[in-house]
């Protein structure tokens, strides 16, 4: 059990080296009344997924398009594969 905890911690630490810190944030809907389909980077699935954004507040893991989300949060993927 201790080994599993250590693996999870090491995995998160390594992920933070590969992914910009804003992409590690959980999706936050915000507290306004709009319902806008936005994207956030999911560190578990390592892809961008949709969520409903209220139009205000929230955090920086919030993108208008899947393309921009992937471009921002997976930008180091090819660079790391070449090393």
UniProtKB/Swiss-Prot annotation:
InterPro entries: Kunitz_BPTI (IPR002223), Kunitz_BPTI_sf (IPR036880), Prtase_inh_Kunz-CS (IPR020901), TFPI/VKTCI-like (IPR050098). Disulfide bonds join 23-73, 32-56, 48-69. Transmembrane segments: none annotated. Keywords: Disulfide bond, Glycoprotein, Lactation, Milk protein, Protease inhibitor, Secreted, Serine protease inhibitor. N-glycosylated. GO terms for molecular function: serine-type endopeptidase inhibitor activity. Residues 23-73 form the BPTI/Kunitz inhibitor domain. Found in the whey fraction of milk. The record marks 33-34 as: Reactive bond. GO terms for biological process: lactation. GO terms for cellular component: extracellular space. It is found in: Secreted. PANTHER family: COLOSTRUM TRYPSIN INHIBITOR, KUNITZ-TYPE PROTEASE INHIBITOR-RELATED. This is Early lactation protein.
